Amino acid sequence: MSNYAPFIKPYVEYNEHGWGPCEVPELDVPYQPFCKGDRLGKICDWTVSLPEKKFPSKYASTFGNSSQYAYFYEDDDSTFHLVDTTGSKAFKPYQRGRYRPNVRNNVRARGRTGRGSQAVGGPGGPAAGGSTANSTKYGKGRNTRNTQNVGRRFGRSAPTRLRESSVMVQSDWVSIEEIDFARLLKLALPNIKEGKDIATCGSLEYYDKLYDRVNLRNEKPLLKMDRVVHTVTTTDDPVIRRLSKTMGNVFATDEILATIMCCTRSNYSWDVVIEKLGTKVFLDKRDNDQFDLLTVNETSLEPPMDEEGSINSAHSLAMEATLINHNFSQQVLRIGDQEPRFKFEEPNPFEEQGVDLASMGYRYRQWDLGNEVVLIARCKHNGVIQGPNGEMQFLSIKALNEWDSKGSNSVEWRQKLDTQRGAVLASELRNNACKLARWTVEAVLAGSDQLKLGYVSRVNPRDHLRHVILGTQQFKPQEFATQINLNMDNAWGVLRCLIDIVMKQPDGKYLIMKDPNKSMIRLYDIPENAFDSDCNDDTESSETFVHSNDN
């Protein structure tokens, strides 16, 4: 036992009156509050020449900036002071990039720049040689209507205004199919050959090349052209009635085909009536003039929202754009009894005695869509021009109109048209993507050699009756389709898909309608007398379009 160290019993305090130790020594150590989020740094860093100016206190303590936590080792009572109740400025610790706004993924930032980084003419297409993003740099070109979004909570936008349907769906209509745009965009029908001419009618006037020199310094007023343009539908066309007896099984006009083939770019509601008689299908339009009106800023982020009756309402702007397009397409031609005209094989099928008809050439063309589907459609040209080698080049003449650059969220034409025409065209491709796509499809279907675009603006934003021509531009339809990301294979695929669905249905009357508030089209089975009342009321308005005298 002597080899082991002695065991000494430790002293254990026993508290008879409570828990814990009986006595605690006074250490007199002050308590300094701290934060676990404080950054750890060096007391002195000799590797830098100057202290950091942007964040000089990034290593400071969160609780070290208030005098109430300061410790003074003094025995004198003079160090006693009251607690400062005025409050000090809260110290924000250094946190790199924690609350930095992410501009790249900011939805509002993308909306201000107008999608300037996407491909030309796609859904929201960008600049053809320019970008509209530069117009908002340094605060220039800002839209005053965007100030209505200021003050809203994040993720909340203005209430969406529901659009009206082009036709009222009746209770006795049977819904057959609903196809959303996502499915339609996946369709394709490649290797469709150029249309074959079956019949050509009408006569064309020659284009006046002086309008190619029009610019901002040499603008020309838009004149009123009192010439009649027929907008006869498919079943009322005498040439189509004659051709349907011997050839083809699907019949339509270029406006109807373009509306269906470009449906994935449309926002407004529209409808097409279909009549199936045995193996023949007629794509028709209702007896009203709404189908022939040109939309304005349909695909814009801020489409026209003014009330009906205003000069800037959607319907008023559509009427104005349609009249401008009619006047421009006739004014740029060499009109006169002594001027030469290009005449097709047959006369104008809609000619009337004592009526001054507009320059219009009709081509009835045939396409083989496969699976025994033969399409025959009436296409048109607006003018003709002689090429450099003496050949005749047919023109499709259209006009873009500016009504209010500030209210329409677009580029100021009078400032950018001569110097940055690509930015102006990119703005129009963004705001009127559907209308430009339809014009391009119509030019491709007709086999036009050139697509002439005119830029027409109001003399005063508050005056919708007077306009001036600011410039013109021309494109080859196929090249322009590529430029605006218009896939003709997809357009033919959409048309063929709807034709196949109708071919499987029994004989009767059907209607294709674009949903006014959803990205889809609907197919209905409707009664034979569904639109008899409209037919009796609007027969005259559906056959001709005459320039109104009050515009």
Swiss-Prot record:
Residues 105-152 are annotated as: Disordered. Residues 119-128 have a biased composition (Gly residues). Keywords: Cytoplasm, Initiation factor, Protein biosynthesis, RNA-binding. mRNA cap-binding component of the eukaryotic translation initiation factor 3 (eIF-3) complex, which is involved in protein synthesis of a specialized repertoire of mRNAs and, together with other initiation factors, stimulates binding of mRNA and methionyl-tRNAi to the 40S ribosome. The eIF-3 complex specifically targets and initiates translation of a subset of mRNAs involved in cell proliferation. In the eIF-3 complex, eif3d specifically recognizes and binds the 7-methylguanosine cap of a subset of mRNAs. The RNA gate region regulates mRNA cap recognition to prevent promiscuous mRNA-binding before assembly of eif3d into the full eukaryotic translation initiation factor 3 (eIF-3) complex. HAMAP family: eIF3d. Its main location: cytoplasm. Residues 290-304 are annotated as: RNA gate. One of its GO terms (cellular component) is eukaryotic 48S preinitiation complex. Belongs to the eIF-3 subunit D family. InterPro entries: eIF3d. It comes from the Eukaryota. Component of the eukaryotic translation initiation factor 3 (eIF-3) complex. The eIF-3 complex interacts with pix. It is found in: Cytoplasm. GO terms for molecular function: mRNA cap binding; translation initiation factor activity. One of its GO terms (biological process) is formation of cytoplasmic translation initiation complex. The keyword DNA repair does not apply. Pfam families: eIF-3_zeta (PF05091). Transmembrane segments: none annotated. This is Eukaryotic translation initiation factor 3 subunit D-2.
